[in-house]
Amino acid sequence: MNKVASLGDIVSGDELNSVKLSRITNLSQSNLWKTLNGKVPMTFAKLVKILSGLNSEEEKMEVVQEFLKHTDKEADIRIAMYYLYLSGYTELLHGLVEKEYKQSVTNNYRDIFRVCLDRQTHSLRSGAFLKEIESLRTQVNLNKTGVNILINTLIIYGYFDLGAYNVLTVLQGMIQEKINEMPRGLEKTLNESELNIICAYAYLMQDEVKMARESLQKVLEKQEIPRLLKATALSIFAESYIFCEPDKALHFFELSLSELRKLKNNKSLLKRKLVENTTAFCCIIHNIPVKLEYIHDDAEIALQCIRQNKNSEACKILNQISNRTAIQDFYLSIATNDEGLRRKAYHRFLKDGNLFYIKIFDILK
């Protein structure tokens, strides 16, 4: 793929040397330069390794887009779909899922990522999303390892939307078994990293903090994972310290935000708002000064009012929220001094299996 030889356009001359790029990519200097000079075929996995040492996300995606314009190798296209999905570049992914491919397995990937895009754009949530996945299961070839892993991973997301974190214990082993069958390479790394992030979040919600951090550490050790995945791992790592070490939590939240600020796609902007809002939550419950631009949800605005003894203002905000979550009901119970509502909110936390954030009841009286 000769177009990628233009890598020199996005790396300054003193950075583009065989020793540095070889170290970044784990490719031999000979293999690296033969690839860049077109003597050895460029693969998507190799391209990602080369680009992983560069800071400009926008320029990385320009090179990725150029690569995809000039390749018809479907193995590369399948991995590219997955990488773009995890990176949050939905526009580039849209371009790939609108095409018809020669290989049925590539069309299976295409159909799976169409559903992924529907979920990301909120047109499919909870029960409807699970129904769509169950329908998809009957249409794709589950004997293909990559297809099997993606489908079962999506099922976990569907149950998580419903708060059923315990379903992980059933599916995790099944998915990991299939991942173990995958050949070593970028797709396996992405599969393992996504599963570890899912596991980490489920462990955290069940208050298995040590296991959550161990899963996240495995993700953060991987160099070629998308920046959005790294930022997500850092944000969950930060969450694990919210109640015990707020200073450490804020440190990791800022690391996550520094990664997210380098991204310009819609998914990263939504993630950034979520991380900023969780940072604000951490600050407010520990009476640490908070940046007002970090508060994006009415619930956190109400919580700040409560901490400032402005309960009537908090009540006004919370009463305007329809279908309040358990934590929003809890805030309202504090603002109104309603012990019955507090008990109701507590039981909703238990029912949802959220054993981590239930600690908020001991902090806010």
PLM feature segments, named:
Residues N319-A345:
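Ankyrin-repeat and related helical/solenoid repeat scaffolds used for protein-protein interactions
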Residues M1-I155, F160, I301, K310-I317, ...:
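Flexible inter-repeat linkers and adjacent short helices
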Residues Q206, E214-N319, N323, I327, ...:
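Alpha-helical scaffold segments of alpha-solenoid architecture
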